[in-house]
Amino acid sequence: MSYVFHRHCHATLPIIDKGEGVYLFDKQGKQYLDACGGAAVSNLGHSHQAVKKAMLEQLERVPFAHTGFFTSDSSERLAELICQHMPEQFNHVYLVSGGSEAVESALKMARQYFVESGKPEKKQFIARQQSYHGNTLGALAVGGNEWRREPFKPILHPSHHIAPCYAYRYQQSHESELDYSLRAANELEAKILELGAENVMAFVAEPIVGATAGAVPATQGYFKRIREICDQYDVLLILDEVMCGVGRSGSFFAFEQEEAEPDLVCMAKGLGAGYQPIGAVVANDRVYQAIADGSGFFQHGHTFMAHPVACAAAVATIETIFQDDLLTAVNQQSALLRNELTSALADLPYIGDIRGKGLFVGIELVADKESKAPLSKATLADKRIKQRAMENGLMCYPMGGTIDGVNGHHILLAPPFIIQSHHIDELVGKLSLTLKEVAETWK
């Protein structure tokens, strides 16, 4: 009997024993190639010596000091490092323990910004359908993942949603990429006008939609137009880079590849690379200064925020990314991964789309390529692919509800940045085998 309240009450899970590089090993000695980083977390693999050394050094000095009494060298260094890789108007970092906490903090920061600025009537959030921003109540309320939201709708704060920027499903055949980008982005303006600009606080979006829709990148010009709309109506832009940030997309921040800068950006997952739970909100000077010059106190906080050991792990993670030139590695290996996936999978009748940026790749499954009709829910494609992949020694991240929270299936890949070409060969080979085996059950 297990005394752990598992995610699934009836799950029988292998017991993890150790990790080495891109591999995990269970207690039975079975080896798994980690092609998803758990959930886009393990950017440096599972046994990086520099990160472990930094954590041990911090533990030997002091493991914990409450931020109501002290700051720490590791938190000060981490905030400085993050800001060094941000545009110049970003100079303050709020450190928390994970992605949901980061999003919750950003939502409250946006609200307090407008209260301190003399606009307390601004209280509405707008986000996108098929988005995911966390499982705590505020983050769940702005998120557009219907399956996750459904049981808790009666207790969620009302938020508003527009269509996602999802070219594979919604770009029309006669539209150019830019035309589609503008049409999708202009939904935000329409929603702001519907609600009244004086009531709208912020727009929340993932630069690359993560697990809910499967590494869906924005089309060219989309976020440029979003930024223009936010500026026009005095709406803050909150970008959620919890999954796609910290180098995952091929740049340290995914928004660097867009023609827009946020007011607040959320980070987590890869920030600590799985060695410690940590998250952050980076605020621009406009938001920070309004609070600093107003009450001077952000009315928020968590016990373990800016945890010294977690910050030490994150410092070592960021330093490793740049010292080892891992952004170059991400871009090189992502090109190889996309090429091999296309070669092995693109012609299969149930592969609809292979997309993403950097080492953040989504594979959308369909019943029919031409119509893009989804697989039937009865196939249980996501669950069967995950199970079979594990049996084949591969960890990937399949999900259902890709299109609307109910229909559609995809597989998310987010391997460690240290992945090598022979690992990619193994990944694609095992994934191809898994898909072909599971597809036999769909007939």
Predicted regions and their residues:
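Conserved N-terminal phosphate-binding loop of PLP-dependent enzymes in the Aspartate aminotransferase
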Residues: 1-443
